[in-house]
Amino acid sequence: MEGSSKKIKITIVTDDGKTNMLSEEKNGQNIIVTHDSSMTLMSTLLKNELVHGSFCGGRGDCGRCRVQFIRGVMIPTMLERSVMTAEELRQGYRLACLTRPKDDCVIRLSFAEEKKIAIISEMKEMSEFDDQLSQQNEQSVNQTTCVSDTCVIEKKASATDKDVETVIAVDLGTTTIAMQLLEIGTGRILDTYCAMNPQRRYGSDVISRIRASVEGKRKELQQMVLFVLKEGVMKFRRRCRSIQGMCIAGNTTMVHLLMGYDVLSLGRHPFTPVEIGLQVYEDSDWEFKVWIAPGINAFVGGDIVAGLYALGLLSDSSSIEHNDRCGELDKGLADIAGKSARLLIDLGTNGEMAITDGRRMIVTATAAGPAFEGGAGAGIVGSDMIAKVAELLQTGVLDETGLLKEPWFSEGISVGEPAVRLYNKDIRALQMAKAAVRAGVEILWKRMGQPPIDQVYLAGGFGYYLDVEAAFRIGLLPVSMRGKVTAAGNTSLAGAYRIGCDLLDGTTDKGQLEKRLSFIESINLAEQEEFNALYVRYIDLR
């Protein structure tokens, strides 16, 4: 009841140097905050800007916002009992997003440490598709390691760069936002600006943000992203006077939040987007045109479309069958048309996949949950999680069904540096995600007619850091793909650049681009009869 709330004092102990908070006062002295007893502890921590945000949006199912009560511990909730061990509960550990302190208390924050986020800001060499991009990126994929809110790659501006005609490419991700200033025609990178997506304050996944938007945070979520974009543009303007345009590629939810749309329809069946085509964003602060890359549906968005565009896979290949050409078949696809297939996989909270044989393209997506971003409470990035599980499997500590042997079955096992504990539930989350992705890959391949796979592209940071052999060892990818896997880097960012340039010079337009997308077949895995059987088949680690 509203009248039953009261103001209490919470003392946060910071004398051990282990507290994972943002305050500059965290070393050497305790912090005292005022708390409304009707609110969750997490709301007070966020209000006082002591933590970045809630990993799961306050649902309590990730188990990562742990605090230890030194005095004034609350009775654990049922959900807290399910995500923490009996010993942890006895030691006073609770979840900040669930607990509501009623009296003065003393706590120590024990949040899962934020991993350094590697923002992949270039695409690997793809000379068979684009000679210009390959010349620019032939050495390596550029990356920025970020654990704070913003990361900037500083480059000295030369006098000759001031009047170069440029385009801004943006990869609007759920976790990070990467921006690049590139020279039109050559693809030369003049500057880069990266930031954590500030919307993570309301959760690390799109469902949490949809809920926050529906509950009244729509304008705030929009302004959070606009602030980052305007900071990046302001930096780029100091570098170059002639910015011709900006193209933003992001998943469907991120784009809807940027545009200020009502996202309620994205959170419930039949998951219908407000707008999925190529859009123009109007802002009086920007004198240049801003395009939003088109998506395919609620689950396969503009980031994947941009990736397909960058790799040369989004050709007008379907017009071979429809006798309705919009342009020439891309060089890379002309060589394989009807003979073999290429597969693009982008793994994160959602696993988006696309397959093409040069004539047809089929796309799908599967919910991977937090497994590829780290086990629910483990605090391990997804690529490391796969490597660790493969190692445990090889050493016999873990069996193929995903069970840890004793004594680790009961106590979990310490892995990595710094050490974190893996429990059976963390491994199970990875198994479920792995089974869903593997089943999705097989369904796409069968729907395409089971052609030989010529190339597999892994997009984004996950693919860049993935130990491919470990992925084969746990059965994430079929062994028939061994030797055919390429970490393609940030294909979303590269595609945003290419789309922006092509729109500027008239190589493509809204009608042509959307016509290409109209030929793409999209399948819902949940509606495929064989999905459940394949899911069960691939749940084991083999």
Give the label of every model feature segment.
Residues 179, 187-205, 264-280, 316-318, ...:
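Glycine-rich phosphate-binding loop of actin/hexokinase-like ATP-binding domains
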Residues 125, 146-165, 288-342:
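Conserved phosphate-binding catalytic cores of ATP/NTP-utilizing and phosphoryl-transfer enzymes
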Residues 35-63, 70-96:
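Immediate flanking context of iron-sulfur cluster ligation sites
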Residues 6-9, 93, 112-124, 132-133, ...:
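Acidic, glycine/GT-rich loop-and beta-edge segments that sit at the periphery of enzyme/chaperone cores
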Residues 192-226, 289-290, 295-311, 358-400, ...:
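Glycine-rich phosphate-binding loop plus the immediately following alpha-helix
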Residues 228-236, 304-311, 430-452:
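Phosphate/ATP-binding catalytic cores across multiple sugar-kinase/actin-like superfamilies
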